[in-house]
Every structure is written in C-alpha cells, then in structure tokens.
UniProtKB/Swiss-Prot annotation:
Protein name: 4-hydroxy-3-methylbut-2-en-1-yl diphosphate synthase (flavodoxin)
MF (Gene Ontology): 4 iron, 4 sulfur cluster binding; 4-hydroxy-3-methylbut-2-en-1-yl diphosphate synthase activity (ferredoxin); 4-hydroxy-3-methylbut-2-enyl-diphosphate synthase activity (flavodoxin); iron ion binding
Pathway listed: Isoprenoid biosynthesis; isopentenyl diphosphate biosynthesis via DXP pathway; isopentenyl diphosphate from 1-deoxy-D-xylulose 5-phosphate: step 5/6
Gene3D superfamilies: Dihydropteroate synthase-like, Sulfite Reductase Hemoprotein, domain 1
Family under the similarity heading: Belongs to the IspG family.
GO terms, biological process: isopentenyl diphosphate biosynthetic process, methylerythritol 4-phosphate pathway; terpenoid biosynthetic process
Cofactor entry: [4Fe-4S] cluster
Organism classification: Bacteria, Pseudomonadati, Pseudomonadota, Gammaproteobacteria, Enterobacterales
Residues annotated as binding [4Fe-4S] cluster: C270, C273, C305, E312
Known function: Converts 2C-methyl-D-erythritol 2,4-cyclodiphosphate (ME-2,4cPP) into 1-hydroxy-2-methyl-2-(E)-butenyl 4-diphosphate.
EC code(s) of this entry: 1.17.7.3
Reactions mediated catalytically: (2E)-4-hydroxy-3-methylbut-2-enyl diphosphate + oxidized [flavodoxin] + H2O + 2 H(+) = 2-C-methyl-D-erythritol 2,4-cyclic diphosphate + reduced [flavodoxin]
Length: 372
C-alpha cells in the first residue's frame, strides 16, 4: 500500500535451524525461550505449543543439567518447531542433546572447557549438521575483558565475540550465528554494528533483559528497529519479563512496522477524541483478541471520524471511518458499505474474516498457477 523502497539487508551466509533457513536473504525469524523448568516436560511442551500457535519460528530451551537433557529428549519428541538448547559450562550436556536431535546449540566455545572438549562438541555438531549460536552478553563478559575495558563497551563485546568465532574458525566450522546482547540499547546497537562489519555469519538480534512487557517492548522496538532498518539482523528475540507468547507478538509487530515481514493484521487506529462516532478503543481491543488466529497479512484502519479516516482507508485493506450512527467501510481504498455503530465489533470481525479468506484463496490460486 505504501511505496517506500525496501530495506537492503546485510549479506550473510545461510544456516538452517531444523528446516528453518537463517541468513542469506531468508525471512527474518522470530523466536522466544521457555521459562518453565525444563524437567517439567508437560509444562514445557505446553508452552512451546503456545509459542507455535502465535507464530514462533524457533524456540530456545535452557538445558542446565543432565536431568534437563533427558527431559529435552522427551520434549523434542512432542513438538514440531525447531529447538535450540541453551548450554553453559558442561560440554557433556551439548553432546547429549545432540544425540537427542537438537536443532541448534547455543554455547560459547570458550566456556565449555579446554580445547579438546570444544573440539568434541564442534565435531559432533558438524557430524550431525547442527548449527551453533555464539551468545555474548554484556552481563557475563570474561573477567580479563572487564578489567581491560573497565565496563561493557561495544569493543569489549566485539572482542569477546571474536574470541569465540576464532575457536570455531580454527576448527573449520562455519555453521554458526552470533549475538552480542546488552540491556542498554545504545551499547547493543553499536556492538552489532561493529560485529556486522567483521563477519559474514547470520546475526541473532536482541536487547537482553529489556524489562517488563511495556518497557521491554519499547527498548526492543527502538534497538531492534534501528538495526533492522539498517539491514542488520537475520533472526531476533524480544526478551521480556512476561509471558513468552508476548515476545513473539512484539517481535512480529516490529517486523510488520518496518514492512519486513507481515503476519496477521496490522491495526491502524486513532487515539480518539471528542469527534469519535463510535468506541474506537473498545473496538480495537476486542478485535485484536478475537482475531489473533488470523495470520493473513492485511492492514485494517479503524478511525473514529472523517478527519483522517478516509485517507487511512485509501491505503488499507479494510478501513472504517466514523460517521453519525453509521460508519463508512472501505475495501482496498473503495467505499463499499456502511456499518451500524452499535454493532461495530461483530460486523467488522465478520468482514475481516471474509477478507482474509478471500486473500488466502487468491494466494492459493497464484501458487497453483506458478506451479503449473
């Protein structure tokens, strides 16, 4: 609907996490991490399936002990989304989850033991075609780097990352991605900018420990939005002290806002004033909840009066412009009907679902024609 030039993405190599491609122009993936006890298999499986339902491409699971590794085996058997095992310090856990079919190992080669143990894990990953994520965090920098720089700096995070990269380079292992996360937006952004100039591997974006649902979403939107708008980033996680499902929703909202990747409805709604002719806020809140199952990309504008309503409707898939007792409904920029203000939510839900079905069918026909 809008004619801005697409963002030019940084060129990177491609890896696969399970069957999900990352890097080299592949769609930017959205992931989250479980916050259950991994040894509670039922709770962890239920949370992973909830994340799948809202669109998670990849899910990370912490595996801190061998008991958790045994639980991971059972979890992996019950879910279809690719799983990343988050492992620190004990190389044996990495070898065990590799045996159980893990799709990616999140490790820092430098903290799982001596050179021989690193080699064992990397050789196992190579043999089983399992990629590795190097995850550098400002809160856990190596002691010598803390002493050298005095505090976490972009240069310190970069140096830490390159140490781990060098471990893999020495072992001729190229199937990896890297993250350099910090809770400070500017520190994280500059660290990623430096790293993007140093390596060709895919970058996993995140503002770590960003905060609660509201403040964390704001920090993540600013930090990830800056990087993504510069073409940096191949996969992302929004880290929130909240239900992990919210991380996926915010992640997709960031991508939708930048018109990088669309999933579901992009609601455009006015903040309301005394000119509104129907309850805009109540309508939007209700529709966001009722239509969470819609994954068809579409823009829906809900504007309470005729000041900005018609203009927004012209560039929306569906648009409502508030009017006296009845409001105008636009479809693909053309006024089609009038909706009763007293029954706005039900009428709009019905129209949106019908439009989503129409768009899905049109795409299905297009795919069939291409396949012919």
């Amino acid at each position: 609907m809008h004619n801005q030039a697409p963002i030019q993405r940084r060129k990177s190599t491609r890896i696969y996490v399970g069957n999900v491609p990352i890097g080299d122009g592949a769609p930017i993936t959205v992931q989250s991490m479980t916050n259950t006890r991994t040894t509670d298999v039922e709770a962890t499986v239920n949370q992973i399936k909830a994340l799948e339902r809202v669109g998670a491409d990849i899910v990370r699971v912490s595996v801190p002990t061998m008991d958790a590794a045994e639980a991971f085996k059972l979890i992996k058997q019950q879910v279809s989304v690719p799983l990343v095992a988050d492992i620190h310090f004990d190389y044996r856990i990495a070898l065990k989850v590799a045996e159980y079919g893990v799709d990616c190992l999140r490790i820092n080669p430098g903290n799982i033991g001596n050179e021989e143990r690193i080699r064992m894990v990397v050789d196992c990953a190579r043999d089983k075609n399992i990629p590795i994520r190097i995850g550098v965090n400002a809160g856990s920098l190596e002691k010598d780097l803390q002493e050298k720089y005095g505090e976490p700096t972009p240069q310190a995070l970069l140096e830490s990352a390159m140490r781990h990269v060098d471990h893999l380079d020495r072992l001729n292992f190229e199937q990896f991605k890297v993250s350099v996360k910090a809770s400070d937006v500017f520190l994280a952004v500059e660290s990623y900018r430096l790293l993007a100039k140093q390596i060709d591997q895919p970058l996993h974006l995140g503002i770590t420990e960003a905060g609660g649902a509201r403040s964390g979403a704001v920090k993540s939107a600013i930090g990830l939005g800056l990087l993504l708008s510069e073409g940096i980033g191949d996969t992302l996680r929004v880290s929130l002290a909240a239900d992990p499902v919210e991380e996926i929703k915010v992640g997709f909202d960031i991508l939708k806002s930048l018109r990088i990747r669309a999933r579901g409805i992009n609601f455009i709604a006015c903040p309301t004033c005394s000119r509104q002719e129907f309850d805009v806020i109540g309508t939007v809140n209700a529709l966001e909840q009722r239509l969470e199952d819609i994954i068809t990309p579409m823009d829906v504008s809900i504007i309470g009066c005729v000041v900005n309503g018609p203009g927004e409707a012209l560039v929306s898939t569906l648009g409502v412009t508030g009017g006296n007792k009845k409001s105008g409904l636009y479809e693909d920029g053309v006024r089609k009907d009038r909706l009763d203000n007293d029954d706005m939510i039900a009428q709009l839900e019905s129209r949106i679902r019908a439009k989503a079905s129409q768009l899905d069918e049109a795409r299905r026909i297009d795919v069939l024609q291409v396949e012919k």
